[in-house]
From Swiss-Prot:
Residue numbers annotated as active site: 40, 64, 128, 131, 154, 163
Entries under SUPFAM superfamilies matching the protein: DNA breaking-rejoining enzymes
Protein name, as recorded: Probable integrase/recombinase YoeC
Keyword Transmembrane helix annotated: no
Keyword DNA-binding: yes
Length: 181
């Protein structure tokens, strides 16, 4: 099983953003949307313009849990949504394939992110990195694990901490302090 990590460094996030912005508008928006929405890639890819344009929130039926959830759209993301969708039709998919006009596949999304990660010197990156990155930075800024647990729809705080890589960070720091015998 391939374990993926959040992108912990804000500088690396900016580097990935710049790389994708220079490469492809759709791919850049996929990254921006993913790290700012806390949605799974399987819930992001089928979204259409009408789901997000001029909205304060979106409704998503989670593919994993089948629960319908109201997802707030961050103010910072609203401008990105406007810029990306202003010339699109409301029934267009946000992340459509140039060839089929249908949503890109999870495999294609994975390839996009892996290519950007490799170009920016990141390892252990996959589609789940987007959601984990949201969680990691939400926690770093708010320290509110209960709210993050609710946002991510996890059953316990310990699952959320492990999911966003905080357990690993804590263990690494403890080993560093210990230093050895």
């Amino acid at each position: 099983m391939h374990i993926v990590q959040p992108i912990r460094s804000l500088e690396k996030i900016q580097e990935v953003k710049q790389y994708l912005l220079n490469k492809n508008k759709r791919d850049y928006f996929l990254f921006i949307f993913g790290i700012n929405s806390a949605l799974r890639i399987s819930d992001i890819l089928p979204l259409q313009v009408k789901d997000v344009q001029n909205k304060d929130h979106l409704w998503a039926t989670e593919s994993k849990t089948k629960k319908k959830r109201k997802i707030l759209i961050l103010e910072s993301l609203k401008q990105e949504i406007y810029e990306y969708t202003k010339d699109m039709k409301e029934n267009e998919y946000l992340f459509k394939s140039v060839r089929t006009r249908k949503p890109i596949s999870r495999i294609q999304a994975y390839r996009i992110l892996r290519e950007a990660a490799a170009a920016c010197g990141l390892e252990e990156i996959g589609t789940h990195t987007l959601r984990k990155t949201f969680g990691y930075h939400f926690y770093q800024r708010t320290k509110d694990i209960a709210e993050l647990q609710r946002i991510l729809n996890h059953s316990s705080p310990s699952i959320t901490m492990r999911y966003i890589g905080i357990d690993e960070d804590t263990t690494r720091a403890a080993y560093k302090v210990f230093g050895g015998l």
